[in-house]
Amino acid sequence: MNIMKRQLCTSSKRFFSTAKNVVKYNTIQDIRNKYFTGTPLSMCTAYDFITATWVNKANCDLLLVGDSLAMTSLGYDSTITLSLNEFKYHVASVCRAEGSSMVVVDMPFGTFESGISDGLKNAIDIMKLDSKVTSVKVEVGSYTKDKYAMKFIEELCSRGIPVMAHIGLTPQKVHSLGGYKVQGSKSLLQMQELYETAMQLQKIGCWSILIECVPHKMAQFITSKLSVPTIGIGAGNGTSGQVLVISDLLGMQGDSVPKFVKQAVNMTDIATQGLKEYIASVEDRTFPERGTHTFKVKEDLWNEFLSSINEK
């Protein structure tokens, strides 16, 4: 058995049939292997073919199709408004991008709250959208209070559906949390419950846990006690990896970003300046430039055309 495990991890030979010319992308085992080396994991959101192409070209380990697209791409004021049908459209678009990034997909608000059976059906539908969808992500509150979500996650795991759990600040539960606030920092009980929730999620089968807006000491401690990778956002650098919303990371909505975001570039300024230059070149007729941006027709054919309509 151990020999077979070593072969599966190191041999170049396949142990399964596959379609021709299938592009390889990261699997959960690939992510685990990197996690065991101690190398931090990289994860970024993507919401369509273009942003997914960027994430893949950058060789990001994981790509999250997050329900945050409700606000960053669709203009809603919260993630709660997003419908499953709208979300599926974006998941399909993301999966058309080529590359090795492993695709993890959120389960938006309303996709599992009405009942376990409905939630299972929706999770299966999401997994079947494309073979690249490797895992779902489920937000969950304290294990002592959000027993339903814990049970739902356990049901998913027991059926072989990979789950990345999301603890700490969970945007889908923002109303019950009293707003977008740091979690696990106000009381001993809150800290204990956050820790125990992570332990319970590992126990019921989650392959990874995302920790959002939690004090760095707390996130680092939880990570040290788990044997599955943690992905942090606003949780310090003591987690197994990091995730950011692509529009925050690339400045696609200007300078207004959360405290925990290190903005790599301000694409809003770059795009706005580019558009201004385009408009100016249109108005002063320097674009399109003849010969550079235009096509030619043979002179004799042009003269023949003019003659044919009596304009010569």
Swiss-Prot record:
An individual GO BP term: pantothenate biosynthetic process
Keywords: Pantothenate biosynthesis, Transferase
Phenotype of gene-disrupted mutants: Impairs growth on beta-alanine but can still utilize pantothenic acid.
GO molecular function, one term: 3-methyl-2-oxobutanoate hydroxymethyltransferase activity
Pathway entry: Cofactor biosynthesis; (R)-pantothenate biosynthesis; (R)-pantoate from 3-methyl-2-oxobutanoate: step 1/2
One GO term describing the cellular component: mitochondrion
Catalysed conversion reaction: 3-methyl-2-oxobutanoate + (6R)-5,10-methylene-5,6,7,8-tetrahydrofolate + H2O = 2-dehydropantoate + (6S)-5,6,7,8-tetrahydrofolate
One Pfam family it belongs to: Pantoate_transf
InterPro entries: Pantoate_hydroxy_MeTrfase, Pyrv/PenolPyrv_kinase-like_dom, Pyrv_kinase-like_dom_sf
SUPFAM superfamilies: Phosphoenolpyruvate/pyruvate domain
EC number, as in UniProt: 2.1.2.11
PANTHER family membership: 3-METHYL-2-OXOBUTANOATE HYDROXYMETHYLTRANSFERASE
Known role: Probable 3-methyl-2-oxobutanoate hydroxymethyltransferase required for pantothenic acid biosynthesis. Acts downstream in the pantothenic acid pathway.
Remarks, miscellaneous: Present with 1420 molecules/cell in log phase SD medium.
Family listed: Belongs to the PanB family.
Protein name (Swiss-Prot/TrEMBL): 3-methyl-2-oxobutanoate hydroxymethyltransferase
Classification of source organism: Eukaryota, Fungi, Dikarya, Ascomycota, Saccharomycotina
